[in-house]
Amino acid sequence: MLVVTAEQMRELDRLTIERFGVPSLTLMERAGEAIAEAILKRFSAIAKRGVLIVAGKGNNGGDGLVVARLLKKKRIPCEVALLARQEDLSPDASHNLLGFKKLKGKVTEISPDGIDLLGQRLTRSRLLVDAIFGTGMKNDVRGLFADAITLMNASGQPIVAVDVPSGLDSEMGTPLGVAIQAEMTVALGYPKLGEVTYPGLGYVGDLVVAEIGIDPRAVAQVAPGSELLERRGISWLVPRRAADSHKGNYGHLLIVAGSRGKTGAAVLACRAAMRSGAGLVTLAAPGSLNSIFATSLVEVMTEPLRENSREEMEPLSDDEWRVLLERKNALLFGPGIGVAVNGATQNTLRWLLRHLAMPWVIDADGLNNLALGLTHLRHAKTAPILTPHPGEMARLIGKDTAAVNADRIGIARAFAVEHRCHLVLKGARTVIATPQGKIFINPTGNAGMASAGMGDVLAGILTALLGQGLNAEDAMKLGVYLHGFIGDRVAAASGEVGLIASDIINGLPAGLSALAAAKS
């Protein structure tokens, strides 16, 4: 599903109206119809006890006035509280105000010194419709509007927001001083970026997307470039298995991972890769740890690496790397590998950046090694998939975690484009970015997945999908969605508390099967 910025939505509206001949009143009518339908579907019983439309003077208010008229026609008791003078309304809003008044609909103008009047109207209603501001808000909400939003939130009545909760920055998802806490938001045309990511998700409530007739030619011209992943689009990416296939058809992965005290990261990544359908997996790790891996990973081959007295891996020669990479078709570097004092891990990563000619993933300590020499990334022979959590992302860009979380989409897109890599910025609503600047937002996953080892599992999943022939973009989309999808299945069955990384691994076969079944 496409996701847009406020500027992109304005341009889509403009092109649809001016170039492709759809009257603005027609778009407004369609918007109002969709909102009214959503209200009656979700809040039918409550609406019959009284609806108050709180409207501004612009086209968002106009949408609300269409809703008022349509509800009035269906004999739903409905009033309008107008946070403006009637003569100041936009032309389209004014037209729809007249339509409501022709049905003898009650309209109350609320002035800055008459906010108590709004309070009285709120107590007489059981459902509120927020039609104050649209997507264009950038400055803090003040005065009458801030007072109105505060009163609406404090009323205890469910609120339906028109397009975007008033007071919410539709792109960043942050409240502009104060914002409507909606129980449901009806996004018009397409959801806005701030509605599908945090913190905006905490204000939107249930998100309903309404088709209002934006011309497809306008969409092609604007090319929004951001999408919310959906199950129906992901299911087609699940690899299928031919009846006469063999293990060689599903990839041979090389996983370079593990160090003293961090063997679990390597184990989780290898197990996740196998459970995600990889045909063969070889783990390359410091030789002193080989007995641990040989015992715990019975389906995985091991390649003991030379190490120094500190049990850190020693750099391999070019010839040794060529032998190790022979007949492999995807690589994972980093889970639990540490940051070697002697520079061996950094040097190994730089060799891979210069020479590796297969799809690959850099995760965990691999990213910490990368942060020590980020300039090498732009010259990678094969663009890797990077999988940072916000702390690792902060180290990569030299900022703090708060700065990363304040603009996850912007930072992910800028980094992927500048460094010509694929990026998975993990967290609630994981952000996927491509070297071309495309963005994908993942809706799956839950707070139970905030536990150790989840990133190692995701890295193993991604590498397995690369090994089975998916390109980097498709592997990221399927892998990230699948990871959270299984987490949601586990949480639904046994709760979020106590959910561990191994639960995701154990759920991979059934999760893949469930996703694949959605194709039919």
Q: Model-predicted segments: where are they?
A:
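Small-residue (G/A/S/T)-rich helix-start motifs and N-terminal tracts that mark the onset
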Residues: M1-L83, S90, E195-A364, N368-I385, ...
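N-terminal small/polar loop signature for handling phosphorylated ligands or for N-terminal nucleophile
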Residues: A68-A154, S291, S296-E307, D319-R327
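Generic structural signal for short, solvent-exposed loop/turn connectors between secondary structure elements
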Residues: I110-G114, G156-P158, V341-G343, M358
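Internal gly/pro-rich beta-alpha loop/helix module
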Residues: S125-L127, I132-G134, K138-P224
